[in-house]
Amino acid sequence: MPASLTWHDVIGQEKEQPYFKETLAYVAAERNAGKTIYPAQHDVFNAFRLTELDQVKVVILGQDPYHGPNQAHGLSFSVLPGVPAPPSLVNIYKELATDIPGFQRPNHGFLQSWAEQGVLLLNTVLTVEAGNAHSHANLGWETFTDKVIAALNEHRDGVIFMLWGAHAQKKGRIIDTQRHFILKAPHPSPLSAHRGFLGCKHFSQANQLLQQHGQQPIDWQPKLPTAE
């Protein structure tokens, strides 16, 4: 694939589609009506800003953004610095601690350093009303994120998709397993993590696959940005 191919090239035309305009208009109207919508407007498309199409090595699919204050910032499972790691992320850290030698559980939940290394942290729905999980499901975001997955499937090779839980696994049905790698496990939520997420070893498996294909492994130790 040409190194210059960007998200703008392959999904930029979605911005002109009626469904996408309607989704953005609905979210804008909700904000204008005084409702608190997460993440903040400038963070909604962060996953694409931080991980360009030609840089994607791993995709971790989430469902919809966290709906508590100061949590969501456009990356699945990640929270802003200074906010405690939510329960699913605590379980992700538990798994990393047993899977990756030397992993130290961080005192934060900010996963931007993963995104900067080529881990696309993609929620299938990109906004949510405060305190109201799944409130923005079926607005049109799913159509958009299906197009994102289709673009990765078509324009990239050897991407590792981590599909945790039935929702992500259903979303991943379109992925060509001849060209890409799929790692499946239950969701890391406390309701299901003990059914096989804990012990799945997805993080070490991903790094083995990357190294087998001549790529840099991911440093899974989340790092806060250093002060300039």
UniProtKB/Swiss-Prot annotation:
Its EC number is 3.2.2.27. Keywords: Cytoplasm, DNA damage, DNA repair, Hydrolase. GO terms for molecular function: uracil DNA N-glycosylase activity. It is found in: Cytoplasm. Gene3D superfamilies: Uracil-DNA glycosylase-like domain. Excises uracil residues from the DNA which can arise as a result of misincorporation of dUMP residues by DNA polymerase or due to deamination of cytosine. It comes from the Bacteria. The active site is at residue 64. This is Uracil-DNA glycosylase. Transmembrane segments: none annotated. Pfam families: UDG. HAMAP family: UDG. The gene is ung. Belongs to the uracil-DNA glycosylase (UDG) superfamily. UNG family. SMART domains: UDG, UreE_C. The lineage of its organism: Bacteria, Pseudomonadati, Pseudomonadota, Gammaproteobacteria, Enterobacterales. It comes from Yersinia enterocolitica serotype O:8 / biotype 1B (strain NCTC 13174 / 8081). It catalyses: Hydrolyzes single-stranded DNA or mismatched double-stranded DNA and polynucleotides, releasing free uracil. SUPFAM superfamilies: Uracil-DNA glycosylase-like. CDD domains: UDG-F1-like (cd10027). The keyword Cytoplasm applies.
